[in-house]
Amino acid sequence: HAAFTVAHEIGHLLGLSHDDSKFCEENFGSTEDKRLMSSILTSIDASKPWSKCTSATITEFLDDGHGNCLLDLPRKQIPGPEELPGQTYDASQQCNLTFGPEYSVCPGMDVCARLWCAVVRQGQMVCLTKKLPAVEGTPCGKGRICLQGKCVDKTKKKYYSTSSHGNWGSWGSWGQCSRSCGGGVQFAYRHCNNPAPKNNGRYCTGK
């Protein structure tokens, strides 16, 4: 959840509005739910995290050269930890950090798909979730860990951690014109999903 919040706030720094803002609704129509720039972050649709409003706004921002400062190389590279976060904090500890020390893992749930945390209230077990999976590397069975939302044999960690660069998919069809009379615009979209970048692989460049 922290990663989504950080991405959301960076979006504001880059000039992005909330998806339900007046600007987005006037220019791109009805609000799209479960996107990173939603005014309330609950769950994110990982297959399409950015709304049309966000995609168009950030594209215009970068095309105008306002993002050139992001190209500066860091003075010093700070290597990340070799261990996955779930190897440091198991599912029970994640429940403690998310909800409080009295919480434990809700039994019978697939923590790799969604982490449910249990607490006893008035003699009954209650399970709560932030609608997010346990972090990468969380133990999910004997010799198994969570990787990309699945419970897999931990020997496959190298396969899941191998980088691959993204490549553009096919263009979609043109959308409706933004105006019925006079000058307007039409949009067509393609996605960086052929394949999608993985494990710090480069995102597609160009338009």
Swiss-Prot record:
**EC numbers, comma separated:** 3.4.24.-
- Give the matching SUPFAM superfamilies: Metalloproteases ('zincins'), catalytic domain, TSP-1 type 1 repeat
Q: Does the keyword Mitochondrion apply?
A: no
Domain remarks:
The spacer domain and the TSP type-1 domains are important for a tight interaction with the extracellular matrix.
Q: Name one GO molecular function term.
A: metalloendopeptidase activity
Would you tell me the protein name for this molecule?
A disintegrin and metalloproteinase with thrombospondin motifs 5
For the ligand (Zn(2+)), the binding residues are H8, H12, H18
- The answer to whether UniProt assigns keyword Zinc to this entry is yes
Database matches in PANTHER family:
A DISINTEGRIN AND METALLOPROTEINASE WITH THROMBOSPONDIN MOTIFS 5 (PTHR13723:SF37), ADAMTS A DISINTEGRIN AND METALLOPROTEASE WITH THROMBOSPONDIN MOTIFS PROTEASE (PTHR13723)
Q: Say where the protein is mainly found.
A: secreted
Q: Which GO terms describe its biological process?
A: extracellular matrix disassembly; myoblast fusion; proteolysis
This protein's GO cellular component annotations are: extracellular region
- Looking at the record, the residues that make up the Peptidase M12B domain are 1-74
Q: What cofactors are annotated for this protein?
A: Zn(2+)
PROSITE patterns found in the cross-reference section: ADAM_MEPRO (PS50215), TSP1 (PS50092), ZINC_PROTEASE (PS00142)
The UniProt note on the cofactor reads as follows: Binds 1 zinc ion per subunit.
Where does the Disintegrin domain lie? 83-164
Post-translational modification, as annotated: The precursor is cleaved by furin and PCSK7 outside of the cell.
This chain's function reads: Metalloproteinase that plays an important role in connective tissue organization, development, inflammation and cell migration. Extracellular matrix (ECM) degrading enzyme that shows proteolytic activity toward the hyalectan group of chondroitin sulfate proteoglycans (CSPGs) including ACAN, VCAN, BCAN and NCAN. Cleavage within the hyalectans occurs at Glu-Xaa recognition motifs. Plays a role in embryonic development, including limb and cardiac morphogenesis, and skeletal muscle development through its VCAN remodeling properties.
Pfam families reported for this sequence: ADAMTS_CR_2, Reprolysin, TSP_1
- Enumerate the UniProt keywords alphabetically: Disulfide bond, Extracellular matrix, Glycoprotein, Hydrolase, Metal-binding, Metalloprotease, Protease, Secreted, Zinc
Protein localization: Secreted, Extracellular space, Extracellular matrix
The active site is formed by E9
